[in-house]
Curated annotation (Swiss-Prot):
Gene: CYS3
GO cellular component, one term: extracellular region
Organism lineage string: Eukaryota, Viridiplantae, Streptophyta, Embryophyta, Tracheophyta
SMART domains, alphabetized: CY (SM00043)
Sorted UniProt keywords: Plant defense, Protease inhibitor, Secreted, Signal, Thiol protease inhibitor
Protein name as annotated: Cysteine proteinase inhibitor 3
Organism expressing this protein natively: Arabidopsis thaliana (Mouse-ear cress)
Biological process, per Gene Ontology: defense response; hyperosmotic response; response to cold; response to oxidative stress; response to water deprivation
Entry's family note: Belongs to the cystatin family. Phytocystatin subfamily.
Functional summary from the UniProt entry: Specific inhibitor of cysteine proteinases. Probably involved in the regulation of endogenous processes and in defense against pests and pathogens.
Signal sequence region: 1-22
Amino acid sequence: MESKTFWIVTLLLCGTIQLAICRSEEKSTEKTMMLGGVHDLRGNQNSGEIESLARFAIQEHNKQQNKILEFKKIVKAREQVVAGTMYHLTLEAKEGDQTKNFEAKVWVKPWMNFKQLQEFKESSS
């Protein structure tokens, strides 16, 4: 009987500890990434995929505004989970003889083969 009680108490303690650990990790994750919030891009912001999105943003802006911007580099990349992913990119581009920073928002829904430039403007900083 004593052995049975020992095992029941041990199992209850282990379960309680496991639950506490899971809740602690859950709260930690909530603090670092709020659903729908903009956060720094995980991984390499200069990956081929992100560079491709930056080049797409410049290409679309050039078409829409009849401009000739030339991509130089990605300065900063952030993402936001929406119905898909909204990429917030700060990029450097050459306009004539000047190099300037621009901010672009590109909305991507990979399961629909959808990519759209939502915003493109010269950076104030």
